[in-house]
């Protein structure tokens, strides 16, 4: 059986003009990531991201080997890839990397390097969000908690966007080939993320929204700055942001989200900040 649930092809901004909401969702929204007792993986042609979820139930689940092409079948999934893992549940879980077990508390992150042969996930109730990018070099496995992150305080309650950005997989804390990854938590009373918005033409980004209530939603804005569109997102759903697209959102309550980037450099500040008045 093919290892990926879905493949997301890259799109030119012209292709998105005039499309309906369902088409927009089909192109960029990644849902259904957590299925009990399974690992779900999706392949995107944006920086060759693989976006997935592991939801162990009644035993361990293992990151599958490659299945295609025939020349790679049976080879480890991370033969030429690196992996970021975040426990997005409210209970702890365990990730075992080539025989070494790492206990991940809620919101803990694990960086797993290229060349790792075996990765398993355990813990009833734990849900592990997975992000993988191609890699050219092997670095060290790193277990990172919020206490290990570089915290950036941004926004304010008066503008409804007071938040803490926790930089997890960044050069200051964890060496990687191209993966950048972090966690943003909005304070009570704040609903806007990534304000003001920005673009970064040299990398793609994926947002994963979580800690949302069952009846809450995030309105995620994307598209070219003068042709903004939105996708309404529920808890524990991801969305791909192409290099040409803005990416920001507003929720019906506060929430958290994981951002992950891949591209030609590891410079977190490589972006073009926009003025909100430029958006249409």
UniProtKB/Swiss-Prot annotation:
Binding residue positions for Zn(2+): 198, 200, 205, 247
Catalytic activity: 5-dehydro-4-deoxy-D-glucuronate = 3-deoxy-D-glycero-2,5-hexodiulosonate
Record-level GO BP terms: D-galacturonate catabolic process; D-glucuronate catabolic process; pectin catabolic process
Broad class of enzyme this protein falls into: isomerase
Keywords for the protein's UniProt record, in alphabetical order: Isomerase, Metal-binding, Zinc
HAMAP family recorded: KduI
Organism field: Phenylobacterium zucineum (strain HLK1)
Annotated GO MF terms: 4-deoxy-L-threo-5-hexosulose-uronate ketol-isomerase activity; zinc ion binding
Enzyme Commission number(s) from the entry: 5.3.1.17
Protein name in UniProt: 4-deoxy-L-threo-5-hexosulose-uronate ketol-isomerase
Residues annotated as signal peptide: none
Family named by the database record: Belongs to the KduI family.
Statement: the UniProt record of this protein carries the keyword Endoplasmic reticulum: no
One Pfam family of this chain: KduI
Originating gene: kduI
Cofactor note: Binds 1 zinc ion per subunit.
Superkingdom, taxonomy of origin: Bacteria
Role description: Catalyzes the isomerization of 5-dehydro-4-deoxy-D-glucuronate to 3-deoxy-D-glycero-2,5-hexodiulosonate.
Required co-factors: Zn(2+)
Biological pathway: Glycan metabolism; pectin degradation; 2-dehydro-3-deoxy-D-gluconate from pectin: step 4/5
């Amino acid at each position: 059986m093919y290892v990926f649930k879905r493949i997301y092809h890259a799109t030119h901004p012209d292709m998105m003009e005039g499309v309906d909401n369902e088409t927009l969702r089909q192109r960029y929204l990644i849902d259904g990531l957590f299925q009990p007792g399974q690992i779900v993986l999706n392949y995107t042609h944006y920086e060759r991201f693989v976006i997935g979820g592991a939801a162990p139930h009644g035993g361990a689940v293992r990151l599958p080997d490659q299945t295609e092409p025939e020349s790679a079948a049976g080879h480890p999934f991370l033969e030429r890839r690196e992996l970021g893992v975040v426990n997005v549940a409210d209970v702890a879980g365990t990730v075992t990397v080539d025989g070494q077990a790492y206990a991940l508390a809620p919101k803990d992150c694990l960086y797993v390097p290229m060349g790792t042969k075996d990765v398993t996930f355990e813990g009833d109730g734990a849900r592990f969000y997975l992000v993988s990018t191609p890699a050219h070099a092997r670095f060290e496995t790193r277990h990172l908690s919020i206490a290990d992150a570089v915290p950036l305080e941004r926004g304010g309650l008066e503008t409804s966007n007071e938040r803490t950005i926790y930089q997890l997989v960044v050069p200051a804390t964890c060496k990687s080939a191209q993966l950048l990854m972090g966690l943003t938590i909005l304070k009570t009373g704040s609903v806007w993320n990534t304000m003001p918005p920005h673009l970064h033409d040299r990398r793609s980004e994926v947002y994963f929204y979580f800690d949302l209530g069952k009846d809450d939603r995030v309105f995620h804005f994307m598209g070219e700055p003068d042709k903004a569109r939105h996708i309404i997102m529920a808890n524990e759903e991801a969305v791909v942001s192409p290099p040409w697209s803005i990416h920001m959102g507003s929720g019906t309550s506060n929430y958290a989200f994981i951002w992950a980037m891949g591209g030609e450099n590891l410079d977190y500040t490589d972006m073009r900040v926009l003025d909100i008045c430029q958006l249409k």
